[in-house]
Amino acid sequence: MSKSRAVVELTARFDLGGDDKIRALSLSPISDSQTLVYLGTYSGSLILLSLDTLTNTVSRLASVSLSPSPVESIFVLGEERGRVLALCNGYLFLLDSLLSQPAKRLGGLLKGINVIAKRVRGRDSSSTDLLPSEISTDSSSSKKFLQLLGAGNLVSDVRGNDSRHERVQQGHYVFAVAIGERMLLIELQCAEKEGLSGSFVVLKEILGIGGIKTLVWLDDYVIAGTVKGYSLISCVTGLSGVIFTLPDVSGPPLLKLLCKEWKVLLLVDNVGVVVDTNGQPIGGSLVFRRRPDSVGELSFYLVTVGDGKMEIHQKKSGACVQSVSFGPQGCGPSLLAADEAGDGNLLVVTTLSKLIFYRRVPYEEQIKDLLRKKRYRETISLVEELDSQGEISKDMLSFLHAQIGYLLLFDLRFEEAVNQFLKSEKMEPSEVFPFIMRDPNRWSLVVPRNRYWGLHPPPAPFEDVVDNGLMAIQRANFLRKAGMDTPVDEEFFSDPPSRADLLDSAIKNITRYLEISREKGLTLPVREGIDTLLMLLYRALNRVEDMENLASSGNNCVVEELETLLTESGHLRTLAFLYATKGMGAKALAIWRLFTKNYSSGLWQDSDDLVPYLHDNELIRLSGKEAAAAEAARILEEPCDPELALQHLSWIADVNPLFAIQVLTSDKRTEELSPEQVIQAIDPKKVEIIQRYFQWLIEERDYTDPQLHTSYALSLARSALECVEVQNGIQEADVPNGSEAHDSNVGSISLFEVDVRERLQAFLQSSDLYDPEEILELVEGSELWLEKAILYRRIGKETLVLQILALKLEDCAAAEQYCVEIGRPDAFMQLLDMYLDPQNGKEPMFKAAVRLLHNHGESLDPLQVLDKLSPDMPLKLASDTILRMLRARVHHHRQGQIVHNISRALDVDSRLARLEERSRHMQINDESLCDSCYARLGTKLFAMYPDDTIVCYKCYRRLGESKSVTGRDFKRDVLIKPGWLVNR
């Protein structure tokens, strides 16, 4: 046996003895441990052998002589107590399976047969059912006589059955036989109860095809091989076509049905072409080393024999995986038969009078052999092939991937090892823990003790694995120099890797495995081990960003295992994130505070570095101090101890007031902070933080504490006063200095988008809970005129409000609107007096006075207006306005008179209409009926409604005085009749 993979192994040999040679061969398994072997010889004998697969012994059971001519073909029909059909000397012979009875020859039309093939139907075939026409009771006596003689019933056509169910009953088999220039499709009927009696029915006769050497019948098509080439024949229509022709110098045709794929292999010398049922080539050609005498199918392999050698090829690629010599070169033609009906593990090869039995090596042993030889690629290919053919279970497939992965890992091929681990569905991620952390450790008990094949050492830390692997490479290199063959990969000899590179590759790939394993549904201890060890691996690779992402997200890291290591290595940010996710906020805040204090002492690389920070799902870059404060604020935004928030609020506000506001105004907090304690915790100089906090309490939390509202208003007022002082100082200074003062505040952080005075004015107008007098006391002597106007209005000092609006702010529209809100005419007169006599040496505001008279002159008394007008007022300014005011006054007076008179007329009209309604007369006679009950009124009392309906007194009491028989309710739906005023 040559050096190759052991797919099959020799199990037994048998020699017929004498000069008789084997011409035909067929196998029939009858149990798991016994297989019958039928041999056809050149002398015309049929010999039965038995192979015991448990003891690998071969025994001769029986033999039958059929004819002096060679036995060409043997078919085993049925399973238990079946039949054997043999082709010898152009005739078909029917025998029992044990050859215990004499053979019966089928005569009639079946003589001179060259080749015979049994019909095979695919698993999902929709081929036509071949059903012979039943012999009816009125059939001619000649047809019945021919059938009784065994001549067969000739059927001229093939009928299809709608149910697509072929009539293959017990003892009914369909064959194609080639006789001279014609081919017959027959059904052989072998009734079990009738012993060897059998008959056949001719289903179809196809003419015009001669010289057939080999046949395969699959579904609706027969593929025939002749010396000229291969043809495709339809068993339905009888039409034939050429698949391809053979070269002039070529060996005889050879066909092999591939039962696994339901395809057919066509041989052209040493080239095999696979075609489907329609004769269409599928895939590429298979090139063998020599032209085979016979071809067999063993699982997903093709087996060829010839010239004393047996070769096993992969079906897909045609690559030879094993070559076995079973006889001398030039020993003559060989035959091959495989157990295609049983478990598919038995293979028999014949040469002359000898039989050699082979059994397929179990795939576990094949894989073990390949793994021992470190032929990993072939192993993986074999495993994938077994999986695609469905010959291994999912559990076994998972086991094999894990086993291959372990061997690759100990061979320092870490990437390929992890790829195999990932393909293993049953492998536990905890199995790789011993490669990362030495035993004993926290997770030693969760590592499963899976039983592998013992082809690799027990798991050990990667340092030991790499060291042992490098030593093995050195030993292999020494042995190779000594002339010995070693299984070490050539890559390690040509380009030996360094220890550091191997460790880096090991850590990177096992990190990849753990990252993917996190997505699996695992127990809590295993999840803790994965995340904790993953953090250690990130630390070893110095992947700081991955460390921080893992620590800041949902994880199962064990803090006790990482706390000391992260502190020693200086990964304090990662440790702070880890503390925060584990609910240890106090420790995390201590680290963030330490960062802000020691920012320039080496905890950060460079004070100018910007740190990425995720804020509202948007990645921004902050300075190191700001990033630390932001992370601290993020912790304090969550539900936590209020004392903890107050403790760290001050330094967060020192770094960035925005983060302090996030802490104070967090909606996630379950326990509110005390406003008094918050004010004490914040530096009084950080006025905007306090104001923003007050604003949040009042607007978002709806606080109604008057003291809080007053404090907020006072704080805003103080800020407004400071702002006014700053603005006055800028205006008094020179322009360049003013610009410089303005630029110096550009970099400051503002918590508000609205000016402080606008916020103060809005709050003073919206809130009713503050103390206006206390605020007035603060702003009394300031220039905050509008604010003071709002406050004076709160306490009801209308005159002061008008003075501020009209004289200080000169806001005529606001002053007039305030007078409208007061709603008294004297307010407009008071405003007019202020415009005409402003006092304090101010000039009269004639335009404002004219505007007031123009807009609200109708509300003023003309005499009082004329009395108030100053003699100094230009007549041209006021003449038109006064004239329009007087006209409007007269118009309003006359309009009032008109309205008064119209009202009186309507009143008179309604009285007259009511009088007319009450004075109406209704004539009742003997024929008058009640509109409700239709009773004669006669001399009864009755009532009449405004819609002229009449009812008796009884119905009136029932309906009421406001609702008539028509359903109209006169209280809701008043009936209006035109009066004298409308008629006029």
From Swiss-Prot:
Membrane topology, as annotated: Peripheral membrane protein
GO cellular-component term (any): cytoplasm
Cellular compartments annotated: Endosome membrane; Cytoplasm
Mutant lacking the gene: phenotype: Embryonic lethality. Heterozygous mutants produce some yellowish seeds with developmentally retarded or abnormally shaped embryos. Conditional dexamethasone (DEX)-inducible mutants exhibit abnormal root morphology.
Keywords of the record: Cytoplasm, Endosome, Membrane, Protein transport, Transport
InterPro entries: CNH_dom, Quinoprotein_ADH-like_sf, Vam6/VPS39/TRAP1, VPS39/TGF_beta_rcpt-assoc_1, VPS39/TGFA1_Znf
Keyword RNA-binding: no
Subunit and interaction comment: Component of the class C core vacuole/endosome tethering (CORVET) complex. Their common core is composed of the class C Vps core proteins VPS11, VCL1, VPS18 and VPS33, which in CORVET further associates with VPS3. Interacts directly with VPS11. Binds to RABF2A and RABF2B.
Protein name: Vacuolar sorting protein 3
Upper lineage: Eukaryota, Viridiplantae, Streptophyta, Embryophyta, Tracheophyta
